[in-house]
């Protein structure tokens, strides 16, 4: 059986050798060129392949049509991936009649994604393993062929566990590859309800928070011990790395981060003390804990600390236009939770952001983007990342005020985009799920799905086409003038501060707010055209975390990308949403303050929105780009989101209004 292998790292070497030992004919091996900035402590697949006389390649983009054609010419019967770092396209996966199979370093479906070796130690797991699974478009989600468990000892660190996993992988492959070669390939679907997903880890993730439990700090030390970058802290401005540690249960009442003793070197955590066995100051040598204390000049009672803001670097300045809106105020909260961000914002109101107005890293001006163009241009020039979030985004306004929608959503935002081009600033632009229009795909793919809208005499499409045209203009500026951009497409985000009941009273709100108003006022819940339209509802916390990761832009992976942000698992019709909302309303402790439920009322869309309206039957995102670029997976169930949103609005109704 002819195989093509994609491999890297020690696991790649183990995989290649196991495939050879099982009697496969390896037509070619694809690997990566080593990164000079990376600590390459592991075996070289390219050297192994060269020594075996097997053709080996390291293309920058193996999914390029040229390489797809070359792999097709090899006519593989089967494809294996052993710790190859890039996802393979569906075109490649479909080239092998027997299928494509990946070796993953966890017991799937747990710990999908990146760095499972480190994450299981961070989380204090007692068991992990390796899994061989069929490759599908979605990373780590294919049917399981075989797996092998590995116990994690309390004294295991990243390197010892790595060696255990390599040994387990070799045993697993030795047992299953001969069977697969005979055409007998086991296939067990993964249970999606048990799936967990983890993203890439960065060196800066090793920063110790001494306010965490001592077991958490110790597990972090284990997870990133050499040859990984290490867990670290600061004494004043001096950085030091902890390479090994042990848990001491008694912190002697000391505050977290306090040095309890220097010989042995022990530091207080939230519920105990960490004894530092070995470590190093700055770029020095590794020494025992007591010598490290001498080097750092530590004495009992000294307090270790977090680094100076951004380790001496200027904070990242984020400009949010429409900062008082639903996305803007939640994003502001997320950014201000990080020390290295400063937020500048403008909006015509400040009710939702009042809690930030005295924050030293929040700078707000009340104003209209269509008037304060000089302020906006100055702050685009001043800031690092620009988010133009101002838009009219409620369906009834598309038919009521189509020209105003075009003027604000397109013309005003185009001016901001041109400022970003002029001053070479990165823009994170809110596209919309509406751009997909009446697309017939089962799930909407950012890079492949057609964008289909209705006729000109249906003004409800003015919002969709305004956003779509801006998407295309931004893309063109990126291609022709080097604009750094990311387009994100929210799919029905919900949560507290979504909009207001007053907006719902004039019909200018999102669907759930309108439904809540009906319950609050004791009026019938209106189901437009029966409420059978399906949407995928996404919790604002999930959405904001994805958006935050776009702003962080780890490894510049979001540059030039379009990213859907939605929860495909939370698909429900508007009628189902209303039923769930009613159930939550009846169970709410404030239920007794509101009128009886007035029932459901089916209403034609024409009578509600006007003759210019046209609806879509479903809107479901593919989130593969978000998984790949952000290491992100939505996790919050729709019921939780509905209950939190309902609670926020019910508690916003004052007592007198409830009684009336």
From Swiss-Prot:
Biological process (GO) annotations held by this record are: lipid A biosynthetic process; lipopolysaccharide biosynthetic process; response to antibiotic
For the region Dehydrogenase ArnADH, give the residue spans: 314-660
- Provide the binding site for (6R)-10-formyltetrahydrofolate: 114, 136-140
Q: Does the keyword Lipid metabolism apply?
A: yes
Residues engaged in binding NAD(+):
347, 368-369
Region Formyltransferase ArnAFT: start and end of each range? 1-304
Q: Where is the active site?
A: 104, 434, 619
Record-annotated residues binding UDP-alpha-D-glucuronate?
Answer: 393, 398, 432-433, 460, 492, 526-535, 613
Where along the sequence does the record put site: Raises pKa of active site His?
140
What family is this? In the N-terminal section; belongs to the Fmt family. UDP-L-Ara4N formyltransferase subfamily.
According to UniProt, the name of this protein is: Bifunctional polymyxin resistance protein ArnA
Which species expresses this protein natively?
Answer: Salmonella paratyphi B (strain ATCC BAA-1250 / SPB7)
